[in-house]
UniProtKB/Swiss-Prot annotation:
Residues 1-19 are virion surface. It comes from Porcine respiratory coronavirus (strain RM4) (PRCoV). It is a single-pass type III membrane protein. Residues 41-82 are intravirion. This is Envelope small membrane protein. Plays a central role in virus morphogenesis and assembly. Acts as a viroporin and self-assembles in host membranes forming pentameric protein-lipid pores that allow ion transport. Also plays a role in the induction of apoptosis. Pfam families: CoV_E. Keywords: Apoptosis, Host Golgi apparatus, Host membrane, Membrane, Transmembrane, Transmembrane helix. It is found in: Host Golgi apparatus membrane. Homopentamer. Interacts with membrane protein M in the budding compartment of the host cell, which is located between endoplasmic reticulum and the Golgi complex. Interacts with Nucleoprotein. InterPro entries: E_protein_aCoV (IPR043507), E_protein_CoV (IPR003873). The gene is E. Its main location: host cell.
Amino acid sequence: MTFPRALTVIDDNGMVISIIFWFLLIIILILLSIALLNIIKLCMVCCNLGRTVIIVPVQHAYDAYKNFMRIKAYNPDGALLV
């Protein structure tokens, strides 16, 4: 069975359609790559936001607690004998 000659614009044995499909495939791969890069950027932004909002303030609070609870070491020269 052959394709009707009236509908054939260029007899290139499917080369034009093949090229169109390859271009579509390349465009889809590029779009997926861009989407993947944007997802990775979003993950990095979320990690930085979590560090800024949660980890750094908790670390400052813990440092303040450590400084507040620090007890000076016993110094025998400074002790008062009663």
